[in-house]
């Protein structure tokens, strides 16, 4: 195990340890634009009595930390981790949905007015990706995604620029 090889004692071996964060970020930079997705690490505190509440709390926090930092794939050591992964994924998407919906709707309004000189396509793309991941995970419905003003077919392109180009054609 990586953290053990780094000399980190068992009580502090978890995916949010700085050694793990640095290793993941180095991998992210090294693999940028290759299509390789990095997965979060597992929580080593198993949800078995008497540790169930503490294990679920740690796992929920670990998964949430990974999602907040852009790691959308994960794996778990124990089937008892699945409820907290499910809860963390849904909580992540549902908590960010209102702001993402408003921002994406506003991005398209501003982009359509700006014409060819739109500065922040990367953020628009990140919001399209967010909504597609939320839909794929089941955290939101197509009706909730439609609150952005995008049609299901526009969102399914997965491309902010394709949507923008299609609207200006």
Task: List PLM regions with ranges.
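Expand to "…catalyze enediolate/carbanion chemistry for C-C bond making/breaking, isomerization
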Residues: 1-169
